[in-house]
Amino acid sequence: MNKGIIYLIQPAELVGTNRYKIGMSNNPDLERCKKGYKKGSRYLCIMECIKPHDLENKIKEIFNNKFKLIAGNEYFEGDDQVMLKLFLEIIKQHNNTNNDNI
């Protein structure tokens, strides 16, 4: 089964704004987060998941309908607590759909 991580972060250059980034890695360790973002980044949530690419696409699709897309296809503007709650709900639904043992 394809395991990896999914995350919601505020890169260091966006701290002090209400802008956040969704990301994923097919590698289930934290190397992507450790090496991919500058010191001072805020990590709102990092979770292990199955089918991380599918989950990231699902989150981006739902976030596109709820928040303002500000850059690329994975940077969004909005309230961090609202985003985090929705992010966790989508992950829970995804995990329940794909693996009852998680």
Annotate each language-model stretch with its function.
Residues 1-102:
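Non-catalytic accessory segments flanking enzymatic or RNA/DNA-binding domains
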